[in-house]
Structure formats: structure tokens, C-alpha cells
Amino acid sequence: MALLLTAVIVLICFGGLTSPSPVPSATALKELIEELVNITQNQKVPLCNGSMVWSLNLTSSMYCAALDSLISISNCSVIQRTKRMLNALCPHKPSAKQVSSEYVRDTKIEVAQFLKDLLRHSRIVFRNERFN
């Protein structure tokens, strides 16, 4: 019985190591959603002086893709906390000098619209995903 219990515990512990990508915790995703709501609501002036970022397909690696797109915006203090949250949710760390070829870059949109799209998609993920 003790051997069976030990085997179950080992399988549970190693199960997370074999998953294809880390699953964000519900708390981290909820904090990101709250931050995006705070940023996007009641915008009377252009966010980040109307800076433009690459529009992305947020269906795969959405946190890394969003971080990769926002990392080039350096003079906007409003999104610094969002970038830190995305950095924590992203398993690999992109840099401003390293442009990822993983994402198709064909259209630029304003940061405000990008964050609204990210908020909408994050809410969908939060509603539909099961968290540990």
C-alpha cells in the first residue's frame, strides 16, 4: 500500500514536468485581466502616445506573443506592470533586440486596441480553462 501511494505521489509530481507548456495559475491570469481592465477603461488620451505594436494571433503562446509585441514600447510607464505580468506568464524570455520569427508580423495596431484584444482573449481563456 505504501509503495502504491509513493508511486502515485511520484506520478503527480512528475506530471507537471511532462506537460507541453506551463499552465498559468488562475490568480496570475486574474491579476493580468484586472490590470488590463484598469488600463483600457475610460481612455481619454491615446495610450502610450498612440504607439503601434504588431497585431498577433493570440491563440497559441499568447503571453509570450503579447510580451514579444509590447517589449519594443519603452517610453510608456502605463504598461510596465502588464509587461512584468506577461514576463512571469511566459516560459521563454524575449528581448527587444531579438525579434521572434515565431509570429507572423503583417499588421500594426495601436497599443490600446492591442490591450483590449488581449483582455478579451484572456477573459475567454479564464472562463474556459481549468486551473490546477
From Swiss-Prot:
Residues 1-18 form the signal peptide. It is found in: Secreted. One of its GO terms (molecular function) is interleukin-13 receptor binding. GO terms for biological process: immune response; inflammatory response; interleukin-13-mediated signaling pathway; macrophage activation; negative regulation of complement-dependent cytotoxicity; negative regulation of endothelial cell apoptotic process; negative regulation of inflammatory response; positive regulation of cold-induced thermogenesis. Gene3D superfamilies: 1.20.1250.10. Cytokine that plays important roles in allergic inflammation and immune response to parasite infection. Synergizes with IL2 in regulating interferon-gamma synthesis. Stimulates B-cell proliferation, and activation of eosinophils, basophils, and mast cells. Plays an important role in controlling IL33 activity by modulating the production of transmembrane and soluble forms of interleukin-1 receptor-like 1/IL1RL1. This is Interleukin-13. It comes from Bos taurus. The lineage of its organism: Eukaryota, Metazoa, Chordata, Craniata, Vertebrata. The gene is IL13.
